[in-house]
Amino acid sequence: MGVLSPTRTMRLWGPRSLGVALGVFMTIGFALQLLGGPFQRRLPGLQLRHSWASSLGPAAPSCPPRQHLVFLKTHKSGSSSVLSLLHRYGDRHGLRFALPARYQFGYPRLFQASRVKGYRPQSGGTQPPFHILCHHMRFNLKEVLQVMPSDSFFFSIVRDPAALARSAFSYYKSTSSAFRKAPSLAAFLANPRAFYRPGARGDHYARNLLWFDFGLPFPPELRTKRGNPHVSRDPNPPQLPSGAGPPAHTLDPNALFHPVPIVADGHSQMSSPASLDLGSSSFIQWNLAWLDSVFDLVLVAEYFDESLVLLADALCWGLDDVVGFMHNAQAGGGQDRSTIDDGGLTTEERQLTARARAWNNLDWALYVHFNRSLWARIKQYGQSRLDSAVAELRARREALAKHCLVGGEALDPKYITDRRFRPFQFGSGKVLGYVLRSGLSLQDQEECERLATPELQYKDKLDAKQFPPTVSLPLKTSRRPSP
């Protein structure tokens, strides 16, 4: 993988090392989050010959596009839509994916390099490098760096734990023993310990799922019966400091965090009706600082389009590279910002939201932290500039949907007869998908298919492209002719 850069070397540190210089470490990590190149607006790569094409002419790129990418695909956070962007970008540019043998890298176990299809550690440097690692895994930095170049761009996505809990309860009700025993999400959150048993089958879906996906250790009172899996798998992970541990809820569960920036004295700030004292827990603080040193950008599902604009900026990609359709969305389960703003919630909904955040207190800490990071980055990018780019992105997406899709939107799976575009149906909710319009040109048909293909089918397509089946000739056709 070559010599590690100073930044990537720092990524190998665990919070135990951070105890020596926590303040400096957090400052550096936060600074890394704020770095980014100028955003490039370019003409659409898909020539649909419609009015959605930008009137701005193509801009000459001022930086090379980043193509070594590590995306931690978190569960029920809009990550399938990001995965679709990566699939399409890598497919168009002939990039090499680090693919699992099936569809996940041994989840829920920690990621291991040996699970990457075609990975040969003893190849002596002759193996072509991987460009993109993006399928479901439980993050394990040391093993990831065995597979990916040290200059890779690391990013992920988080979602408000209250919204995530609603989606996870519906999707994983048959998988999680805790959810399966509960008659409703409200009943579960009213008394979660009556249903939840640490270490029970699938119960990592029922509490602090984001924290789990990031591969972070759990404080003693939250550890599973199997113990903290970091201990035996990774010698340099975050570790719980001796004599330290977070209180039961480090964040006020009644504080409905409102992430919209408020200008005060010329500075953008975050508003909250209650103080969110993350500093009260060194355990949480150290883990968040470690994540800051590892991840170059963390997207926020409730601000998905804003996040995509920042992603394009950070990667030096064109706007069209991040224009796409939503994938793996459940019927009636859209990305609604009302969950993070108490203004539109009923009393019952507020109570459910507060309980979900309190139960998933580590996820709530993650969400608050990376939400603030996102808005700090937006301030640096420029609010008016961002608003313009988001409006353009949405206009292009809408034009693509009208041009490519029957009805111009996602449809109930009962209308999807083409198996290439029918999303995998799991859980109690219906997963929506797409039907392509007829009469598309060959070029437009190809691009619209890329946009509409669900993640499992696209992974299979990439697998077949990267590992084409070998055809052996029958023995009789390979015989030499008689003299």
UniProtKB/Swiss-Prot annotation:
InterPro entries recorded: Gal-3-0_sulfotransfrase, P-loop_NTPase
Location in or out of the cell: Golgi apparatus, Golgi stack membrane
TM ranges: 19-39
GO molecular function: galactose 3-O-sulfotransferase activity; galactosylceramide sulfotransferase activity
Topology in membrane: Single-pass type II membrane protein
Cytoplasmic side stretches: 1-18
GO cellular component, one term: Golgi cisterna membrane
EC number: 2.8.2.-
Positions of glycan attachment: 371
Top EC group: transferase
Lumenal side: 40-483
Pathway participation: Protein modification; carbohydrate sulfation
Region of interest: Disordered: 225-248
Keywords of the record: Glycoprotein, Golgi apparatus, Membrane, Signal-anchor, Transferase, Transmembrane, Transmembrane helix
GO biological process: glycolipid biosynthetic process
Family classification: Belongs to the galactose-3-O-sulfotransferase family.
Protein name: Galactose-3-O-sulfotransferase 4
Organism the protein comes from: Bos taurus (Bovine)
Gene giving rise to this polypeptide: GAL3ST4
